């Protein structure tokens, strides 16, 4: 238990590495809960803010220098991965080569603006949607729509 945790943390510290402790039992219990509210209460009861799996994913993205951006349509919201520092043109190519070939611009709402306004429509109404060109550097959590013409 705690002896092994301490040894792993000490070793990782010497190697300048991050340690993320994950309990398979706790992760399993979290996944068995039905609602986000139940999960939140369970996590609070055991002194955690988020599941270990979420920490692992975030840490892996950081280690690999990756960001996530989102596209949203009437039927589907999808997360896409792009390298940190990549631009809108590169992001368009992640979705489809035609998006990249015929790239005109991208409509972008930042993650924080989206959360603050509660929806894409309300973000647009608040003037938080902007048009960006090929060289726009994609930020983590951006909600993007690509305009293209082939």
Which sequence ranges carry the predicted segments?
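Conserved beta-strand/loop subsegment of P-loop NTPase cores
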Residues: 15-22
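Short, surface-exposed secondary-structure boundary micro-motifs
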Residues: 148-149
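Short, small-residue-biased leader/transition segments that mark boundaries at the very start
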Residues: 1-4
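Nucleotide-binding motor/catalytic cores of P-loop/tubulin-like NTPases across gene-expression machines
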Residues: 24-33, 76-145
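Anionic-ligand-binding alpha/beta catalytic cores of soluble enzymes and soluble regulatory domains
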Residues: 24-76
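Electropositive, glycine-dotted interaction segments
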Residues: 6-9
């Amino acid at each position: 238990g705690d002896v092994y945790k301490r040894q792993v943390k000490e070793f990782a510290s010497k190697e300048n590495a991050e340690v993320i402790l994950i309990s398979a039992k706790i992760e399993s219990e979290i996944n068995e809960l039905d609602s986000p509210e139940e999960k939140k209460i369970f996590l609070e009861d055991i002194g955690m803010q988020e599941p270990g799996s979420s920490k692992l994913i975030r840490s892996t993205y950081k280690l690999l220098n990756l960001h996530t951006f989102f596209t949203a349509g009437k039927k589907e919201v999808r997360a896409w991965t792009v390298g940190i520092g990549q631009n809108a043109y590169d992001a368009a190519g992640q979705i489809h080569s035609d998006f990249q070939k015929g790239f005109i611009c991208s409509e972008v709402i930042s993650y924080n603006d989206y959360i603050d306004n509660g929806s894409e429509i309300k973000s647009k109404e608040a003037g938080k949607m902007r048009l960006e060109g090929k060289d726009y550097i994609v930020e983590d959590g951006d909600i993007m729509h690509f305009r293209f013409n082939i």
